Amino acid sequence: VYPVPLSDIAKNQIKAYITKNIVALGALTGLFNLPVESLKDSIKAKFSRKGEKIVSMNYQALEAGINYVKENLVKKDGFEFPPPIGLKDVVIMEGNQAIAKGCVAAGCQFYAAYPITPATSVGNYIVEDLIRKDGWLYQAEDEIASLAMAIGASFAGAKAMTATSGPGLSLMSEFIGYAGMTETPVVIVDVQRVGPATGMPTKHEQGDLYHAVYGSHGEIPRAVLAPISVEDSFYMAVEAFNLAEKYQMPVIMLTDAAMSLRAEAFPTPDLSKLNIVNRLIYNSEEDKEQKFIRHGRFLRYALFTEDGITPMGIPGDPNAIHAITGLERQENSDPRNRPDIRTYQMNKRFKKLEKLLEEDYDRFIEIDAPYKDADIGIITWGLTASITKEAVQRLRSRGLKINAMYPRLLWPVKEDVFEFFAKSSKRILIPETNYYGQLATIVKDRTHIRPISYNIYRGEPFIPKEIEDIVDFLMENQEITEGRFTPEHIYGEKAYGLI
């Protein structure tokens, strides 16, 4: 709290009580480094019709607020506004709009979906860009058909995607497995909402992580991404296509209802600097030794590549004729159910995840760990990560040693990265907006870490103070090293007053 005598300054220095709000603006400017010249431009635009005298008076009020802060207050927090980057360099987008723009920037050519809250607007935003680029948008009869169409379009050579929410993701489970089995690249955007069943269609939750990671019968390679902001949604959409195309597998991108409607300003993406990855296509002219041809048959699922990635054939290419089927198959795509072929083909498919972890994983992990012996290390994802960043800043300004890790690639998991981060902190806290603590459970399953899980599931995101409060609670209770906690543990009966 910073006390500033706004009324006194306005009355006695400026001689105009009505300027109290401008004095307050000056105080905020002094405290948080707001752009003075931009504010003066706004004052001039607002008051110029009332004459130069009024404009000058408001300038004085602004300066008076700034000067009071400089001369009388000691700043106790670490917050300030970054220098403005200029309106011409800024775009303002909602989360779903950023996803749509990112998918188009990645080269998306086909979009099929069935309308569902809160994912519908992804299609609304993407349609104009697709039409302009001779792409296709199709409203399917249901979510099952929409993913089937996207897989078919991808098999035909197009970069393809669908978008849905939790109920639709449930319906897509079999075709997610089909995309993994056939090694077909496809992007699935899941704008999460409160479940199960119809749940609360317009409310926020991070409840679909288990389904994204494990959904479908059997086991397939897949990647699961989660942006942490609107700006991040643009770039993670590009990365979703890059991973799908490079590793020929389904990639699920988890966002949520709150982020889908949230508008943010961020620097205009420079499309020329984006790294765009395209799939490996069979080219008979490059395959001089005919490594991928045996007995006149194209080896779509050849077993001899070190990373499991084999060239895809485009329908119509007489040199790359093959079948696509959900049945297990041998190298030339003919169905087979021999134990040895099954084992070899499973190993081939999962080699791709090994390559992903080796070549691409690290850039998806943001680690903010300035302390070697932090009081608490926080790991979290999605919108909760964005909120946690503000809480971490506040906690550090109070002298607490807090490290943080924000994974954007939630599956596969590179265990040693989590283990390395955990060594820098005495305890690990994982806040999430779901009941089980889904990321916390995955971390426990894949690593030796035993985190403290903090969960809310009321249909709303955390606020930064709630992250601060759980950290304060843990600092007061040093004996707590693991377990699951909810607001009731922190606030008692008052917890329900937060809802």
Stretches with model-predicted labels:
Residues 1-106, 110-112:
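Active-site cofactor/cluster-binding pocket
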Residues 92-96, 100-106, 236, 241-499:
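Flexible, low-complexity linker and terminal segments
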Residues 112, 121, 172, 197-198, ...:
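Short helix/loop capping segments that flank catalytic or ligand/cofactor-binding pockets
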Residues 112, 138, 160-162, 186-189, ...:
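Short hydrophobic alpha-helical runs that function as membrane-insertion/retention elements
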